[in-house]
Amino acid sequence: PAKVAKCIESLKNSCSLPVTIKHRIGVDEDDSFRNLNNFVRHVANAGADRFTVHARKAILKGLNPKQNRTIPPLKYDVVKKLKKLNPELLIEINGGFNSIDKSIKALGDFDGVMIGRSVYKHPLRWSEIDQKVYGINTKPKFASEIIFSLIPYIEKHMSNGGKSWDICKHLINLVEGIPKAKIWR
């Protein structure tokens, strides 16, 4: 906790932007709630503005990063307890949120929900989130509209020596489940 707190202090002293820390609920055998809460309190006292808590522990001895995203069990209850003990802190939860409904339900217990891979893998599934969470009545764009709107950006990237694939590879999932998706890919 002391090293991380020192980093947070340095960041806070060198910029005016909010500082967020993303962390797991534990590492290897160091996964007691007491240690987690102590870590968060220590870092909060150093000035962290927001905590994004991944609801899994990290197993550094024996699991690779990909395995660490699926094998350690999600423990939402641990993050919920952390928030209850620290209501003054901005705490958002991360890990395993793959639907808008599941995310909205979590907002009842946390200050936010971080959505990661699900948005990248299934972006159109998330196109109604602003409407469902904030009541903003926006019409979701079609994948083709999004892709065509990026052409000037891709052209600029290419004029600076980049390859179109640098950007296009991240658009493949936009066409998931639509007719003739293979043509777009």
Regions found by a protein language model. Name each.
Residues I21-K22, I93:
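Structural beta-sheet core signal
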Residues H23-I25, T52-K57:
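Short, structured patches in soluble enzyme cores that scaffold and shape functional sites
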